[in-house]
Swiss-Prot record:
It comes from Bacillus subtilis (strain 168). It is a multi-pass membrane protein. One of its GO terms (biological process) is amino acid transport. Pfam families: LysE. Belongs to the Rht family. The chain crosses the membrane at residues 5-25, 50-70, 75-95, 155-175. Keywords: Cell membrane, Membrane, Transmembrane, Transmembrane helix. GO terms for molecular function: amino acid transmembrane transporter activity. NCBIfam families: 2A76 (TIGR00949). GO terms for cellular component: plasma membrane. This is Uncharacterized membrane protein YrhP.
Length: 210
């Protein structure tokens, strides 16, 4: 119980500190609406669940110790973040009149496509993030009692991390959607898109070099 209470604030800090997930949730919520943001969060939770299963099977340690596997995941993740960053940097203003009309028409005809894209971005950004592997290999074991059921404890710790992430990003989606009416200035949107792109590329480069 004591170790669990010590783990919760650490997990909360890992979630709250801005990263690639934060930028993706902000971008998709602003561009496609709160529902797309929630699908992004669902993808994020799916990615974390994927690594939970991997950890339970003992494969996270294998991946962390395998230079080839870990490096492959690292570079794939870096390339994916850079791709998303470049795409965001060169994207049109989210709220230009033509873009809004075109987007409204496209979403009305095939909304699932946008939600699927948001979901996949959330999933892949976590599945291809080597730092997620390290959380399961280096941080969580510090709060596991080796005399107890290790898998059960791992599931509890991972569930807490996932729950905190979902709650935090749902709150972020709500705030962004509420503030959207003050963020429709085209100049603001252009600056935001480019800053988002630069930050994502920066995260990608940092991931590749770490």
């Amino acid at each position: 119980m004591h170790s669990l209470l010590a783990y919760i604030p650490i997990a909360a800090m890992m979630v709250i500190i801005p990263g690639a997930d934060t930028m993706l949730v902000m971008k998709n919520t602003l561009r496609y609406g709160p529902k797309a943001g929630r699908y992004n969060i669902l993808g994020l939770a799916t990615g974390l669940s994927f690594w939970t299963v991997i950890a339970i099977l003992g494969l996270s340690v294998v991946i962390a110790k395998s230079v080839i596997l870990f490096t492959t995941i690292k570079y794939l993740g870096a390339a994916y973040l850079i791709y998303l960053g470049v795409k965001s940097f060169f994207a049109k203003s989210m709220f230009s009149l033509d873009d809004m009309q075109s987007q409204a028409k496209n979403m009305a005809s095939s909304p699932k496509r946008y939600y699927k894209t948001s979901f996949m971005q959330g999933s892949l950004s976590n599945i291809l993030n080597p730092k997620t592997v390290l959380v399961y290999v280096t941080i969580m074991p510090q709060f596991i009692n080796l005399n107890g059921n290790i898998n059960q404890q791992l599931i509890i710790l991972a569930s807490i991390l996932t729950l905190l992430a979902v709650l935090w990003f749902l709150f972020l989606v709500y705030i962004i959607d509420y503030a959207k009416k003050w963020m429709k200035n085209s100049k603001f949107q252009k600056v935001f898109q480019k800053i988002t792109g630069i930050i994502l590329v920066g995260f990608g480069i940092k991931t590749g070099l770490s």
